[in-house]
Amino acid sequence: MLIRRLALHQLRRFSAVDLSPQPGLNLLTGDNGAGKTSVLEALHLMAYGRSFRGRVRDGLVRQGQEALEIFVEWDEQRADHPPHRRKAGLRHSGQDWKGRLDGEDVAQLGNLCAALAVVTFEPGSHALVSGGGEPRRRFLDWGLFHVEPDFLSLWRRYSRALKQRNALLKQGGPSRMLDTWDHELAEAGEPLTSRRQHYLERLQQRTVALAASLAPQLGIQGLELSPGWRRHELPLADALLLARERDRQAGYTSVGPHRADWSVDFHSIPGRDALSRGQAKLTALACLLAQAEDYAEQRGEWPVIALDDLASELDRTHQARVLERLLNGPAQIFITATETPAALLDLTHIARFHVEHAQIVAVP
């Protein structure tokens, strides 16, 4: 996956900018607050439907404007398809949105996000390891969404059934109607959990190997899924039935894949609560790069790699290890920094851009 053009309109500080990235490494430098991160935000928004710094309506649209617009043009280079050029556009006001993909309107934002794959490491990425379960569930589902074409329909089926069951619980609905939605939840939730389990097992080997290469002191030994109910003891249908009275009192469904989580097992660190912020960042980075490598193997092309403020997030040793691994592969990489990171000072084959006064200028 190779981005050829990125155009931003009315996004944070930018009125209108047009960027032509190059294959390999693209370095964006500039002072703090110049807008470097906004470029990566735009890519992330196109790939995930949201910014990694909050909701669109929370400051992503330039002050005084109605909506932001993003246009991306890229070459898709999958092993099972001939190379071809793709185009996507998004107009987002924070409330309403309109998207186009390859000249056609898209009805669901997920269809737009399915086209462009971006793996992002940014200052908040440590939450993947040290935060609550929601970002870890999103991590699993994003990977499955991109490598298993029917996963999205399965996920939507489960989400729809969960919404209906929760509504019945709040309304005090009859047991026969709850029976119907319990059955639907189990029919979608069991295979959804099996997909997550198999995917995490696949990532485990890569994550352990990556961590041993990038940060051996972490001693990462494996990844473990908590499915959201005692799956080793009983099927989801039984778990839902057993929890029904408790769920009636609470007004929501307390068991199932929506309560799932996963954890990293360490050799000598007792758990995520004992991690320093730096250890959490390195662990998250190992997981994210493992996901990118798995995507590349399954799809036959690399996702775009976006590394925000790398020099502030990692020390020189770990910067060098990460960049050495990435630069030995075919991925297109975007890095932001206030100045050229030490690990890149001796490299010549880099596309350099400077961000200043709401403009992006290519540096010869």
From Swiss-Prot:
Binding site for ATP: 30-37
Major localization class: cytoplasm
GO cellular component: cytoplasm
GO molecular function list: ATP binding; single-stranded DNA binding
UniProt keyword annotation of Lipoprotein present: no
InterPro entries per record: DNA-binding_RecF (IPR001238), DNA-binding_RecF_CS (IPR018078), P-loop_NTPase (IPR027417), RecF/RecN/SMC_N (IPR003395), RecF_2 (IPR042174)
Pfam families with a match to the protein in the record: SMC_N (PF02463)
Keywords: ATP-binding, Cytoplasm, DNA damage, DNA repair, DNA replication, DNA-binding, Nucleotide-binding, SOS response
Gene Ontology biological-process annotations: DNA replication; DNA synthesis involved in DNA repair; double-strand break repair; SOS response
Family, per entry: Belongs to the RecF family.
HAMAP family for this protein: RecF
Function: The RecF protein is involved in DNA metabolism; it is required for DNA replication and normal SOS inducibility. RecF binds preferentially to single-stranded, linear DNA. It also seems to bind ATP.
PANTHER family for this protein: DNA REPLICATION AND REPAIR PROTEIN RECF
UniProt name for this protein: DNA replication and repair protein RecF
Source organism (scientific name): Stenotrophomonas maltophilia (strain K279a)
